[in-house]
Amino acid sequence: MRIPSRGRGEEGKEQWTLVPENVDDLWHLSHVLEPGDRVGGDTTRRIQRNDENLRDTGGQREHLVVTIEVADVEFARFANRLRVGGEIISCSREDELGHYHTLNVESHDEIIVTKKFAPDQRKRIEAAEEAAENADVAVATIEEGEAHIHTVAQYGTEEQFSRTATTGKGEYSQPRTELFAEFAAALSRMDVDAIILAGPGFTKQDAEEYIQSNNPEIIDKLTIVDTAAVGDRGVHEVLKRGAVDEVQTQTRISAEAELIDELMEGIATGEKIAYGIDEVAKAAEFGAVDDLLVVDDQLREERRDSGDWSTDVDTVLQNVEQQGGSVTVLSGEFDPGQRLRNLGGIAALLRYRLQ
């Protein structure tokens, strides 16, 4: 996510210019935008001309700049777009004011959002921005006598390591283990969440075995992918196959799963946990919450007043953050979030047990 500008809007609201850069960013926006927010951007709309001096286009689409008051939001995953519908309150054609319109927001579209951001919503957008700037995945490509390491961020790839050496027999050759040692040492120094180890043939498997024996601290980060080439071409193959996106998703799910496992263990042993809105709200009032966990779609429903919780969820979140606790919003699309939903959609890891 890019945030080109931030400013103040009317009635104490904030006005942010946002540019989603991938499907994940569109998904984040679907959990931030709410009814009553204002969203502006470029669009097309079918216009029926009624002016007798102008030729009727039969409803030809025209380019417009509009701002709508949000009524509904739909994340169309398979279309890779976010549909934001509502009444047009500002438009480059005044005769379109008051009509209902749907903005189809896709990757790299710029939109202007005016709303009162809740702390977790602001955190979500800023985390998406940070993800675009920081590399969290390395693509390591290797074949006989050649090895490369690239970091992958949403703005592109950057080569961090490159070695070419003659391995095998001969006066100027070096043992394969020397190349593997340099390669593994470089990977160990990298601050990334996951490493995709790719390349043709079996050299990558041999490198994996070397890492298992000599650099075991990074072995759990490795995912093996077959490619026909190494270097820039190999990285392109990895990206084209969607392997990086898949690894990033699995990394996020893994982090969420660790929290849920800790929660379930606490339930089993009677440790310091709370679950269900009533228990969590009580713990938040006492300042006992260390980490609050909530399912994203449940949070969205409660904010739209279409949920069934009797307590205002934003009050609970504010109490937690004011007392120095953290808030983790889990995706309801994956197993950790689904397990949390079965516990009422909200739970907390506590600093101390409530009597």
UniProtKB/Swiss-Prot annotation:
What name goes with this protein?
A: Protein pelota homolog
Q: What does this protein do?
A: May function in recognizing stalled ribosomes, interact with stem-loop structures in stalled mRNA molecules, and effect endonucleolytic cleavage of the mRNA. May play a role in the release non-functional ribosomes and degradation of damaged mRNAs. Has endoribonuclease activity.
What does the similarity note say?
A: Belongs to the eukaryotic release factor 1 family. Pelota subfamily.
Note what the entry says on domains. The N-terminal domain has the RNA-binding Sm fold. It harbors the endoribonuclease activity.
**Gene3D superfamilies assigned to the protein according to its UniProt record, in alphabetical order:** 3.30.1330.30, eRF1 domain 2 (3.30.420.60), Pelota, domain A (2.30.30.870)
SUPFAM superfamilies the record matches: Dom34/Pelota N-terminal domain-like, L30e-like, Translational machinery components
Enzyme Commission number, as recorded: 3.1.-.-
Q: Which domain of life is it from?
A: Archaea
Location in the cell: Cytoplasm
Q: Which UniProt keywords apply?
A: Cytoplasm, Endonuclease, Hydrolase, Metal-binding, Nuclease
Is Metal-binding among the key words of this record? Answer: yes
Q: What are the protein's GO molecular function terms?
A: endonuclease activity; metal ion binding
**Quaternary form?**
Monomer.
Provenance organism: Haloquadratum walsbyi (strain DSM 16790 / HBSQ001)
Any one Pfam family here would be eRF1_3
Q: Which InterPro entries match?
A: eFR1_2_sf, eRF1_1_Pelota, eRF1_2, eRF1_3, Pelota/DOM34_N, Pelota_arc, Ribosomal_eL30-like_sf, Transl-rel_pelota
Which GO BP terms apply?
Answer: nonfunctional rRNA decay; nuclear-transcribed mRNA catabolic process, no-go decay; nuclear-transcribed mRNA catabolic process, non-stop decay; ribosome disassembly; RNA surveillance
Please tell me one Gene Ontology term that the record gives under cellular component: cytoplasm
- Write down the PANTHER family for this protein, in alphabetical order: PELOTA, PROTEIN PELOTA HOMOLOG
Cofactor dependence: a divalent metal cation
